[in-house]
């Protein structure tokens, strides 16, 4: 009896994990509004009522998917930002962590796009609980680096750099291959990921003036 009792929680956890995985794929592919709980249940192979054992409703399931999916990303960025190294190196580590996390879990990129596309339905809702905190940490490092001279940014605010990095990786992972003839390009192939990461680092270094002096033309906005 004790062994059987011990197996029940393990089975429940496996079922919950399967529900989260199925819901993540469906939310990423269809968006929140178009994803039905019946579809999630059918994908997992359980009855719709079984979902409510683990999640209070559809919104609760979506919130759990977001927390689970972005928890890994938040942990990697926290580690990169908190390492006791120079600001420029911490930012570079964060860039690498960002690319690695999105590539490792491509649904993250699609969830970001879906969240942006459905922004009118949740104008004040952040993408995931740690998003605003992580942005504050990144922007604080930007200001510290600019004040100390360790960073010589092209722009006086960090939004252009954040947009260039986030937009490039999200589009690269979630949408770029769809615009090409089938089979011509695999964005998740190791050599392509390595190339994208190098490009991302070069872009961020260029925009933040890491390792290169800031030119007068950049300060005045001239080409």
Regions found by a protein language model. Name each.
Residues 5-9:
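Short Lys/Arg-rich basic patches
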Residues 14, 18, 22, 26-60, ...:
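Helix-turn-helix
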Residues 103-125, 175-183:
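Amphipathic alpha-helical segments used for helix-helix packing
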Residues 1-3, 100, 104, 132-148, ...:
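C-terminal peripheral helix-coil segments that are non-catalytic and often amphipathic
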Residues 29-33, 84, 105, 148:
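Short coil/turn segments at alpha/beta junctions that flank glycine-rich nucleotide-binding fingerprints
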Residues 64, 78-108, 155-165, 194-197, ...:
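Hydrophobic alpha-helical connector segments
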């Amino acid at each position: 009896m004790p062994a059987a009792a011990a197996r029940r929680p393990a089975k429940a956890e496996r079922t919950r994990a399967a529900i989260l995985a199925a819901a993540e794929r469906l939310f990423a592919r269809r968006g929140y509004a178009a994803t039905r709980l019946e579809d999630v249940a059918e994908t997992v192979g359980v009855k719709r009522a079984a979902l409510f054992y683990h999640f209070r409703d559809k919104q609760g399931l979506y919130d759990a998917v977001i927390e689970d999916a972005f928890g890994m990303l938040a942990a990697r960025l926290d580690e990169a930002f908190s390492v006791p190294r120079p600001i420029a190196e911490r930012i570079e580590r964060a860039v690498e962590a960002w690319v690695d996390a999105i590539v490792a879990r491509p649904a993250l990129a699609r969830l970001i796009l879906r969240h942006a596309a459905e922004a009118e339905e949740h104008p004040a809702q952040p993408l995931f609980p740690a998003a605003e905190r992580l942005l504050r940490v990144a922007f604080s490092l930007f200001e510290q680096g600019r004040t100390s001279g360790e960073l010589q940014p092209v722009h006086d605010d960090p939004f252009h750099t954040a947009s260039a990095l986030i937009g490039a990786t999200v589009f690269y992972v979630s949408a770029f291959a769809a615009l090409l003839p089938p089979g011509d390009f695999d964005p998740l192939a190791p050599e392509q990921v390595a190339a994208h990461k190098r490009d991302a680092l070069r872009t961020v270094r260029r925009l933040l003036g890491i390792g290169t002096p800031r030119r007068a033309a950049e300060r005045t906005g001239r080409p």
